């Protein structure tokens, strides 16, 4: 088995030597990161001097900062290797292309304005309001301060405060929800309209990517993680010059945990690969496992996988034969994973059938499993109860962003250790908590407090 593992790494090395793009699939515990490390070391050993002379680099794209740091720890620092999260790298690559970014920003704003116009036209107030006069009233800074101060208040309180500010609004408050939506949409339309005119008049500001908050502020030329990927996809896939600059600078691109990579990123890399195919001087290696897709935004199965050489590693270096056998039953995709060891035979597993009245604590006690037992819970409600944040989750589910058809956002944006995936709402909550902690800490500096205020 160990010789077969060596042969698999040799197969990867040959793809790198021949600039043949590949997809390396390996199950849990197979040593994907180890294979990635060995691949980089192979390139450095065989092509390291040429890379330095040509001012070229190996690009290793990771999904999280934790993965980035792990790879850097294993490799050590090397000037010929760039290990970066995809957002960090893409912004560094595209930030200088302000003319192209501004054009994308203009198109994005136009698209948003179309959506807002549809919402305005669909609002029950649209036929009863003279928009220009209404806009002048609601875009007043004093009104907006009052409006947002009571935006989440009960309907009765909201009506009283708004009427108290200006009796003009009284006829439009029969439906508080319609009024709130109408004010927000008209105000957003007004602000985006100003920014669009600036761009069309060639008076635009620089487009900026904010890695801290996953929320667009298009009127301020600030874009979030998702919008950065959208802009980069549109720009790079349509610009052969940028594809050439990319492939000339980074002839070796290795993508860690490809299954969690956004499809827009895969499209970018795929377009560069197709552009460079005839030159035989660019290779892409995707490392991962389609069934270990954690984040909702990831591709899972690699698109156009048939265009990449498929390399599979079925060996598990981490677990006993019994665990590997159990994993195979759960995967149920005939991957055929097996332990790399012939003498790692330890433990057993059993299946139990339970009904809706199942009680985990009673089950563990009756089966003498109280000690040395780890439990994998599948439902968010069960996880939150076991970890002691069930009240927080219950409160969160009252927000439209995390209820009904949007319930999957609880997993995608809330139950996250990866800050890049965390939604703007919770990111802002964490930022505010951080501010409270800093402001009450006697060791905090004025600079730290000011930084929070300026970024909020």
Q: Residue spans of the language-model regions?
A:
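The feature marks helicase ATPase cores and/or their adjacent C-terminal helical subdomains
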Residues: 1-456
């Amino acid at each position: 088995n160990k010789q077969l593992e060596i042969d698999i790494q040799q197969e990867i090395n040959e793809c790198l030597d021949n600039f043949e793009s590949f997809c390396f699939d390996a199950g849990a515990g197979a040593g994907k990161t180890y294979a990635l490390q060995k691949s980089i070391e192979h390139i450095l050993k065989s092509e390291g001097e040429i890379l330095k002379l040509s001012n070229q680099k190996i690009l290793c794209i990771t999904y999280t900062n934790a993965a980035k740091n792990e790879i850097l720890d294993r490799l050590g620092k090397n000037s010929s290797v760039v290990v970066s999260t995809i957002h960090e790298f893409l912004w560094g690559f595209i930030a200088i292309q302000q003319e192209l970014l501004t054009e994308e920003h203009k198109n994005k704003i136009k698209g948003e304005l179309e959506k807002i116009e549809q919402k305005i036209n669909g609002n029950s107030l649209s036929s009863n309001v003279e928009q220009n006069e209404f806009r002048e009233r609601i875009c007043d800074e004093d009104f907006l301060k009052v409006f947002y101060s009571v935006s989440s208040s009960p309907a009765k309180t909201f009506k009283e405060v708004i009427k108290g500010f200006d009796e003009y609004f009284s006829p439009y408050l029969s439906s508080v929800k319609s009024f709130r939506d109408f004010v927000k949409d008209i105000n957003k339309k007004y602000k985006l309209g100003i920014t669009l005119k600036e761009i069309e008049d060639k008076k635009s500001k620089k487009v900026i990517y904010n890695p801290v908050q996953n929320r667009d502020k298009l009127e301020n030329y600030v874009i979030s993680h998702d919008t950065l990927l959208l802009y980069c996809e549109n720009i790079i896939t349509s610009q052969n010059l940028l594809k050439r600059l990319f492939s000339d600078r980074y002839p070796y691109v290795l993508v860690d945990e490809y299954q969690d990579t956004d499809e827009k990123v895969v499209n970018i890399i795929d377009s560069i690969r197709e552009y460079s195919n005839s030159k035989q001087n660019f290779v892409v290696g995707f490392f991962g496992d389609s069934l270990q897709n954690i984040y909702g935004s990831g591709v899972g199965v690699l698109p156009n996988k048939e265009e990449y050489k498929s390399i599979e590693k079925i060996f598990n270096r981490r677990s006993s034969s019994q665990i590997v056998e159990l994993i195979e039953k759960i995967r149920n995709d005939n991957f055929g994973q097996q332990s790399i060891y012939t003498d790692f035979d330890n433990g057993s597993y059993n299946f139990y059938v339970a009904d809706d009245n199942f009680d985990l604590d009673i089950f563990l006690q009756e089966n003498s499993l109280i000690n040395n037992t780890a439990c994998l819970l599948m439902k968010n409600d069960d996880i939150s109860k076991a970890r002691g944040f069930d009240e927080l989750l219950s409160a969160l589910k009252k927000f439209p962003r995390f209820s009904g058809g949007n319930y999957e956002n609880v997993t995608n944006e809330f139950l996250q250790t990866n800050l890049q995936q965390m939604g703007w709402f919770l990111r802002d909550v964490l930022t505010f908590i951080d501010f409270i902690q800093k402001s009450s800490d006697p060791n905090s500096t004025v600079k730290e407090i000011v930084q929070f205020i300026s970024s909020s």
